């Protein structure tokens, strides 16, 4: 296999264990790869504001792909400080803020069309904009344990409008003023069956990308927006050819990244159809140093 110069890591089920931790061996493997000059970055469906602190604090992490590829960020030399700076109150804001290198938003009319379709279903709808998660009070009330777990990773203590996610009175009213700023839509349904029943309606939309981060959700970005295209855009910006890019993932929302990267690695806990895309499938899962195994196998 070619020398790897940039490695994009999915979070849930890949970099993060089921207990939402990074194993010591994986942390060390990342530090060693960075010391050798490899660019290692998270590639997530989350908004920048909800990037877990333990990920932002990984050794040498400077860049992040967020919102399923709708944005690519340069977090500078203090990633955690940069994220907190951008989404903190003005009184506590630092001078260093993350720079958005790539941002690919919905065309206004397409954003309105997608939002209109989501309104036909009951669930917890979040709108991703400018690195934040926007939802209204009804969506917040519908939010189940899965979504609460995801939000809990953004910070240990927070208030509803601390900047990392923003609760508005009415999402439709907010959309009337911000339809030109949308990175991604994401709805969590009551269960996987409800999401599966709704999927055909979303697949019928033109000019969008539809993925599932989990069986009970549906996520939509603009056409051509995915983790894979974001990885290649960053690699091109850094002068790294596609052949020297690595993607590591486990689920359907990693498909485009795995298909487009020069080398694709899938975790032992990955979905069978995703393992079929891999150049390398680990013997270890996300709880047992799977990412470290990838790095060791590829000599990173």
Model-derived features with residue positions:
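Mg2+-dependent phosphoryl-transfer enzymes with acidic/Ser/Thr/Gly-rich catalytic loops
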Residues: 2-6, 22-23, 35, 203, ...
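Short, acidic loop-to-helix structural element flanking the phosphoryl-transfer center
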Residues: 20-36, 104-111, 167-170, 194, ...
């Amino acid at each position: 296999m070619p020398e790897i110069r940039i490695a994009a890591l999915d979070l849930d089920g890949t970099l993060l264990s089921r207990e939402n931790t990074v194993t010591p061996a994986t942390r060390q493997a990342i530090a060693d790869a960075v010391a050798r000059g490899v660019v290692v970055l998270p590639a997530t469906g989350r908004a920048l504001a909800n990037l877990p602190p333990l990920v932002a604090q990984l050794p040498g992490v400077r860049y992040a792909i967020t919102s399923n590829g709708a944005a690519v960020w340069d977090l500078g030399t203090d990633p955690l400080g940069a994220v907190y700076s951008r989404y903190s109150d003005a009184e506590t804001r630092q001078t260093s803020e993350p720079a958005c290198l790539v941002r690919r938003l919905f065309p206004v009319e397409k954003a309105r069309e997608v939002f209109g379709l989501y309104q036909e279903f009951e669930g917890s709808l979040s709108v991703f904009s400018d690195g934040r998660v926007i939802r209204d009070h009804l969506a917040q009330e519908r939010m189940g344990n899965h979504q609460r777990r995801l939000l809990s990773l953004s910070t240990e203590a927070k208030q509803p409008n601390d900047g990392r996610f923003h609760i508005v009175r009415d999402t439709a009213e907010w959309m009337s003023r911000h339809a030109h700023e949308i990175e991604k839509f994401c709805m969590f349904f009551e269960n996987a069956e409800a999401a599966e029943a709704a999927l055909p309606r979303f697949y019928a939309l033109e000019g969008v990308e539809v993925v599932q981060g989990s069986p009970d959700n549906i996520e939509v970005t603009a056409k051509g927006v995915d983790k894979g295209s974001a990885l290649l855009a960053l690699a091109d910006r850094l002068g790294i050819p596609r052949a020297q890019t690595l993607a590591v993932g486990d689920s359907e929302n990693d498909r485009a990244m795995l298909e487009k990267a020069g080398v694709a690695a899938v975790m032992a806990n990955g979905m069978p159809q995703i393992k079929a895309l891999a150049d390398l499938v680990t013997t270890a899962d996300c709880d047992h140093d799977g990412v470290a195994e990838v790095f060791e196998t590829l000599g990173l």
